[in-house]
Amino acid sequence: MLILLPAVDVVDGRAVRLVQGKAGSETEYGSALDAALGWQRDGAEWIHLVDLDAAFGRGSNRELLAEVVGKLDVQVELSGGIRDDDSLAAALATGCARVNLGTAALENPQWCARAIGEHGDKVAVGLDVQTIDGQHRLRGRGWETDGGDLWEVLERLERQGCSRYVVTDVTKDGTLGGPNLDLLGAVADRTDAPVIASGGVSSLDDLRAIATLTGRGVEGAIVGKALYAGRFTLPQALAAVAE
């Protein structure tokens, strides 16, 4: 069954949602802790917790994120600004189930390989993809820099033994524009590692569509704006993917 990961994106201690990952496009939804506890109460088994300040290189919510992880009984995937030994150690020390490496995997392949080697399935790599002139390009640092060709980087990560990928279509994220099923399927077909879908989910039918890819290796879906905007409730979403 498809695993659902409600997203809590944190800016200055508050839960927010961005449009296409752009700084300044935030809509605020209250305290990060309250948001996370709310999703747990609604039946989430995983929370996707993102430090957007760290991702954009403008600060950190490290202590708060550790507090949130400590107060939750469910598993947490922690993301945002994890790009060196210090930030990786701090992220793992929160007690989260796993961390997502983003920019670091693109900018520092040697460090990324070591992190994957040392921490195994506690490390996933985020593949933030933008299609430009028919080419799948990766985006780094809050999606503002080019990180190379998707397939070349994926091949490298496969050799390094990456245990899981979180695939985001940057053009879809926060837009409620529907997920990029072709991209998800294409990545899943090129790896034996599980893939988590991120970006664009707008309806229960979108989740049902992603759920049809579980046989190809798509393990879960991160859901953000659709939940916060009230398109559906988490219990409705959990029921839809259990059908």
UniProtKB/Swiss-Prot annotation:
Enzyme class, spelled out: isomerase
Transmembrane residue ranges: none
Catalytic reaction(s) noted: 1-(5-phospho-beta-D-ribosyl)-5-[(5-phospho-beta-D-ribosylamino)methylideneamino]imidazole-4-carboxamide = 5-[(5-phospho-1-deoxy-D-ribulos-1-ylimino)methylamino]-1-(5-phospho-beta-D-ribosyl)imidazole-4-carboxamide; N-(5-phospho-beta-D-ribosyl)anthranilate = 1-(2-carboxyphenylamino)-1-deoxy-D-ribulose 5-phosphate
Record's keyword terms, sorted: Amino-acid biosynthesis, Aromatic amino acid biosynthesis, Cytoplasm, Histidine biosynthesis, Isomerase, Tryptophan biosynthesis
Cystine crosslinks: none
GO function terms (MF aspect): 1-(5-phosphoribosyl)-5-[(5-phosphoribosylamino)methylideneamino]imidazole-4-carboxamide isomerase activity; phosphoribosylanthranilate isomerase activity
Active site, renumbered: D9 (proton acceptor), D128 (proton donor)
Pathway annotation: Amino-acid biosynthesis; L-histidine biosynthesis; L-histidine from 5-phospho-alpha-D-ribose 1-diphosphate: step 4/9; Amino-acid biosynthesis; L-tryptophan biosynthesis; L-tryptophan from chorismate: step 3/5
Enzyme Commission (EC) number: 5.3.1.16, 5.3.1.24
InterPro entries in alphabetical order: Aldolase_TIM (IPR013785), His_biosynth (IPR006062), HisA/PriA_Actinobacteria (IPR010188), Isoase_HisA-like (IPR044524), Isoase_HisA-like_bact (IPR023016), RibuloseP-bd_barrel (IPR011060)
Domain of life: Bacteria
Compartment(s) where it occurs, according to its Swiss-Prot or TrEMBL record: Cytoplasm
GO cellular component terms listed in the entry, alphabetical order: cytoplasm
A single BP term in Gene Ontology: L-histidine biosynthetic process
Similarity section: Belongs to the HisA/HisF family.
Biological function: Involved in both the histidine and tryptophan biosynthetic pathways.
NCBIfam families: hisA-trpF (TIGR01919)
Protein's name in the database: Phosphoribosyl isomerase A
Source taxonomy: Bacteria, Bacillati, Actinomycetota, Actinomycetes, Mycobacteriales
